[in-house]
Amino acid sequence: MKKIVGEMLAPLPVCLGLIGAGLLLLWFTRKKFLGKVLASVGFVLLTLLSIQAVSGRIIQTLESQYKPLDVSHLQTRLESAGEPPVSQIVVLAGGISGDPTLPPPLQISKASRERLLEGIRLYRLLPGSQLILTGGSGLQSVSEATILSRVAQSHGVKKSDMVLEVQSRDTKDHPRFVSAFVKDQPFLLVTSAYHMPRAMKLFAKYNLFPIPSPIGHWRVPEGFPLWYWLPGASGLRLAELATHEYLGLAWAWLQGQI
């Protein structure tokens, strides 16, 4: 039910709903003015959210909360404080295709691919570290964590250096199941930059100590090209991601998860 409501509140359904309601009022009722207002608001909102100059700024309100991790700076800070180096890297899954006939690298989504590659990069920079890959099976027969581990092995990560957390179904489950592996030790948390604020709040609620390592920040294109100011699917996708995260934050707050 939560996912259905989330999909219905995404920018495209909301805008189309406003336009549709406005047209119905215009065609079949005497409330012409209200119909014009609803249809106009829906059209203007859809147009604005489809422009990357607008939707990009919205998603940056999430992504700007955590900067990319500087590993060398982190190591220096830990050494100067007399603390042991971080040895665990938690990678949050970001979805899979669900098509088992595809090779593992093609089964994972763009978000999962970015997160996993960042986790592997950190793993190589931190000798002796361990990758903790998250993600249950959901409707698929094979868990997300298992597929991520297969891709990681193809990139040279040793199977013995990975731990699979295969019970979580969504973001709210990750802290509960990951806590069994990290206990009270600091760890690197890898997820998409727009997703990091919600993930950090959820892990903090479990009294865990994540060190954020966000990946996939949206950047303003150099030179402000024409397409940056025109409506398009890419802009609408950014608005959808931002809306999903803000709805997720609101839901988590209402449920007392953050």
Name these PLM-found stretches.
Residues M1-W27:
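Membrane-embedded alpha-helical segments of integral membrane proteins
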Residues P225-L230, R237-I258:
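Extracytoplasmic/luminal low-complexity segments enriched in Pro/Gly and acidic/polar residues
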Residues V37-Q52:
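Hydrophobic membrane-insertion alpha-helices, especially the h-region
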Residues W27-G35:
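Membrane-interface helix-boundary motifs at transmembrane edges
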